Amino acid sequence: VGSEMCIRDRTSDAAYEERATLFGRSLHRDARTDAQLLQEALTVAQKADVIVAALGESSEMSGESSSRTSLDIPDVQRTLLKELLKTGKPVVLVLFTGRPLTLEWEQAHVPAILNVWFGGSEAAYAIGDVLFGAINPSGKLTMTFPKNVGQIPLYYAHKNTGRPLHEGKWFEKFRSNYLDVDNEPLYPFGYGLSYTTFNYGDITLDRTSMPMDGSLTAKVILTNTGSRDGAEVVQLYIRDKVAESTRPVKELKGFQKVFLKAGESREITFKITPDLLKYYNYELQYVAEPGAFDLMIGTDSQHVKTATFVLH
């Protein structure tokens, strides 16, 4: 927004370019009111087959000394988005942001959301490639997106609680939960969609007991179950179940980006060594301690397959 960059032409039709370029090749600040700009946008949207709504934060809203008390998109933008959806035309939300936002309303009402952060001078070309289907996206989130600002801090590698909520439960009295929202994020760490789908088989381990000077191999079958070729980021997480110091419920220990043709399956392998299990203890010694570990492989930090092994 406000850039001289335009999405590259998908046709050499000069008439198409004249129709598509409604306000010149760049946008500038002016004195029009929000109501005037809203009406102008709706007038243009009525002529479109598909609406691409570029909304979110400006770059000045992120970074040092740029805190916010709300993580919703600005009110005037949500008003515009609601009006665009009322047209009945397909709407794609292209989201510019420098931080996780609360997008529960958008998730429930907008058919497609493309999070683009703050791209550089070539970002428009990449966005255009994804929107037009020239590229099958395979990116994954490096931050957790909450449902509500009240859930913050919210991150995947948190410590366990002494009163955990039972799996599958939304609320239990005197457990670690909220009265008005469940504990889960809107989009977990490592989340990301594609124009195809992938299926993970169960994890197999070549051994379930590993000595301090040994290793083990974890394998999983990954299948592209969709109709398009695509890439998947296979993520490896490990949990130290009992340690001298409290350990996170899971930690990212590795990942592989795997390209599969439609219908193709492949065996994905991770080598596990004691070095992957080490942490700094109270004496600041970098150690791996004997005990049980959960090994998780999946598409993001919440949707994983699990196997258990013992280090001795």
Language-model regions, residue ranges each:
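Short acidic, flexible loop segments centered on an aromatic residue
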Residues: 227-244, 250-252
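Intrinsically disordered, low-complexity Pro/Gly/Ser/Thr-rich segments with frequent PxxP/GP/PP motifs
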Residues: 244-280
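Terminal connector regions
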Residues: 273-312
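Intrinsic-disorder/low-complexity, polar/charged segments enriched in Ser/Thr/Lys/Arg/Asp/Glu/Gln
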Residues: 215-217, 265-269, 304-306
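Short, small-residue-biased leader/transition segments that mark boundaries at the very start
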Residues: 1-7
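Secreted, periplasmic, or luminal enzymes acting at the cell surface/secretory milieu
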Residues: 3, 12-29, 96-231, 237, ...
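Hydrophobic helix-and-loop "lid/oligomerization" segment in the mid-to-C-terminal part
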Residues: 12-108
